Every structure is written in structure tokens, then in C-alpha cells.
Amino acid sequence: GNAPNAAVTFARQGAEVSFISVVGDDPAGQTIVRVLDDEHINTSKVLIDKKLKSSFSTIMLAPSGERTILDYPGTAFLKDEHINFSNLDSDWLYVSSVGSMPLITKIMKRAHENGVNIAFNPASYELKNLQECADLLQYVTLFAVNKEEAKKFVDGNTIQELAAKLSESVKYTLVSDGPHGSVATDGLRLVTAGMYEDVPVIDRTGAGDAFTSGFVIKIAQGKSLEEAITFGSANSTSVVGAIGSKTNILKGNVKLHDMPLTITRI
């Protein structure tokens, strides 16, 4: 899912990563933990709940690279007892879906109080609870959504307009529009990017996660908007070239070429 995909990007870029979640005591849960362990991600904060079955997805892939995902939510709906709040003491916290608005609010509030930078990439559950989701932005450092999701929060026709308006609420905003490009802002400048490369698409699964997490890790490492959006775009481009959401996630010290960027001031 979103968070494991992001965790692998962070780890392959040299970050010290801990994964906080819950899995069932079953083959799917064991596989999740093993895959993360193999990527040198700390899984000591993963709770195994023997009463629940792990979340998993079945992906039906078309020759075009498009896919249909059949999802079994399982442990996706977290509860307070699944989270050790003393673990919320990192430099950055990447939050995707928690499956409970009261719990995600509690997590973000506690992390914010601890001085943690929060990157938030809401999933469908959070977006269905729009007002509560919008209220979370007071705790967020970096907010990442696609164009249609951004329109739920602010008015605007272009990704540039949407990002500029969202930047009034958070320090960094990232708005994507699939193959039509993306825009990032720090509240002062808008950096608009197109495609990194036009490559044959094998599997689009995880492309959005690769883009967002690639941007997040470079901002967390103190890189510029230009460097962050370039790396996110390159990471996404790499991922669609192979089957599997983690297979082609870029590793450290990869050499990237420049890509066309348009920079404007807000």
C-alpha cells in the first residue's frame, strides 16, 4: 500500500526509516514485514494483531499498464491500541491512510506537538471525511494530492491555481495531474514539471506513491523544490517500467538528467 511504498523510497535514499502499522498473524502480514526488513526498514513498531487478517490487494493488470485493484481492507482500519504514541518522535512523519479520523487527528496533533514535520498524502477514506481532513492541515508541513483531490479543498482550474491556494494553509504543496505534469510550491514560488521521460508503461501501480515519496524525501533532505520535483518525477517514471510498485524504486546516488521546469512567483 501507500505507506510501504513510500517507506522503500525513503530507505533507498539513505533515510533511517521506521514503519508504524498493524498486520495480522498470517502469510500476508509476514510477507509485508519481510519485504520491509529486506529494505533495511525498522519494523519493530509494527504490531501483530492475531484477531485480524492483514490487508492485501489483488491487481489485475492490462497490457496498457492500467490496472484494477481489488482490495481487502483487513487491518487497514487502525485503532488507538494499535499505536504507541511515544513512537511519534522522528524528524518527519509520512501519513497516508489510517481509517479513523479521530485517530489520525490524534496522531498528527501529538506529532506536531513533538516538533515533527508531517507529510500528508490522504487516501479515499480521509477524502470522504472532507471537513475533518481539511482541519488536519493545521498540523501538516507538506500536503500532496492530485488535481481532482485538490479541487475538494480549494477552488481553481489549473494545478498552479490549486497549489497556490493550498499553500496558504501548508508550507509545501504538491499537486499532480498524471501525465499532464505536476506543480510544487513553498508558498513563494511555483515549480511546474512535465514528464521526466516518455517511457513504455508496464505497470502504473505505485507510480503516484513513488512521485510523492520521492518529492518528500528530497524536501526532508533539504533539497530545493526543483531537485525534489525532478527526483519525484524520475522515481515515478522508473516505477512504471516494471511490474510491481517497489521493483524499480530508485536507489541512492542515481544520476538524473535535467528536465524542463517552469518557475513562477506567487
Residue ranges and their predicted role:
Residues 4-12, 107-110:
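Histidine-anchored nucleotide/phosphate-binding helix
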